[in-house]
Amino acid sequence: MMYGFQNEDFLKTLNGAVAQIGEINRIADKVSDLGYKNIYLVGTGGTYAIISPLAYMLKTNSALVWYHEIAAELLAAKPRSLTKDSLFITASLSGTTKETIAAAEYARSMGATVISFVGDRTAQLAAVSDYVVENAACNDNLVGELHIQFFALGARLMMKNGEFPQYERFVETLRKMPEVLLKVREQNDERALAFAEKHKDTGFHMCVGAGNTWGETYCFA
């Protein structure tokens, strides 16, 4: 089994993400009913990478206007399209990532609606957000957790926009992901170990990805 990996913790975290789908739907429905003109998907480091598949999902399935931004670059650029009619979506496990907090604060100063995903509702990022989704996690299971939650939010926003007719089937698939992803990990343990042993001393690694895998590639690199 993967070193330091705990099946119970993995399932608890991902099932926790699934349990938040109802709250995510409530948030998506409310902001959709209030109306917005564009969506900002913002992160720092790994969070910027992990939200990338949601950007690709919107790109290939929706007419919604979206922007995928690194928090610090957004602060430097101060895009004119970030306004009171924007949704600002971000995440931070600790809720203390300074660039993300600063970007969220700036977005709110422009009147944007801030939705954040955090591991602790008492963290600073939550305090500067309009809507907060809380689910405790750790680095071993954060990626799967955020994918479930980001995809649930994106799918609901598209559905409320009169798009994504496969919404119900998609969400039912998301609900199955904790067990499915655990099985994938277990099935690939030996393969991953063999790869690591073979290439642990390899001097140069090239990480290649495209489409909805680009973010994972960026994160790994």
Predicted regions and their residues:
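Active-site phosphate/pyrophosphate-binding segments
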Residues: M2-N38, V133, N139-L142, A155-A221
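Glycine-rich phosphate-binding loops that contact phosphosugars or nucleotide phosphates
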Residues: D33-M177, A210, A221
